[in-house]
Amino acid sequence: FDENVSELDRQALIKEAFDFKVDKNGANSIPRTFMVKDHYSDVPWSKRISGKSFWDKKWIDIEFDPVMEIDLNPEWKTLDEYSSALRKKSRAKLRRIDKDSSALVLRELSYEEVVENADKLIALYSMVYGRAGFKLGMLYKEDLVFLKKYWKDDFPVIGYYFDNELVGFQCGIVTDYSVEAFFVGFNLNENKTHSIYQRMLIEFIKQGIARGVMKISLGRTALDIKSSLGAGPKRLVCHMKVNNRPIIHSLMRAVASSSSPKIPKLKRAWDDELTSPLSISSRS
């Protein structure tokens, strides 16, 4: 949503979008389960009633791990300027990652190249996806191809090559406001040698600086690594509603009561006076 759209108007628009029927086996039926994914939560832990939605009493709030985000200072025009605001250990880490990944060749793939390499890209993605502790949906090659076709240059797919072999890729949505990391994939053995994943995080930061965005969203996993590079945690909730299924609704509320992960103590990447506002607000 545009930042000028109020919270009440956002809720009304979302609820209106759910007022539809689908055709199932030739008969119209109304979906019984709805989900609104990734809504920022500023409700303090002490005031949060697990499971009960702060958005609407008929909904359930389920909270997972926080998303790691970076607020960019508009004065930062290069990665060096970004790095200069970090603490000494984080600057050293950036240099180490750059050295470890120096043998890699990075190249943005065209739509035609995404289509041509779709099977390989998904195979690399599956190596990472298979190790994930929490899984909500999976990327298929048709999705990847469609996203590139629809978003064009705003969906850069970066290939990582070692000895002319594709060993990794990253992709995300890049707008004038934010960079949102979507999916990554890489050869696990090459990652150990060349720090592919950590290099990808740096490339997302570079994309944000080059585009002049306000925010970079790096996703939920690997909180410690991302915090050491300057990201801070932001709490997100998923709103769920189950119609005409009181037993399932009760079970979902029970699940929600145990889905309130505390944000762990993370590494401090910024000097005290330059600490990201995201890191401060996430402590509420």
Model regions: which residues?
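Residues forming anionic-ligand binding surfaces in small-molecule and nucleic-acid pockets
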Residues: 1-3
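An exposure/low-complexity boundary signal
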Residues: 6-30, 234-239, 248-251, 256
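Hydrophobic alpha-helix feature that most strongly marks membrane-spanning transmembrane helices
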Residues: 126-133, 149-152, 165, 171-172, ...
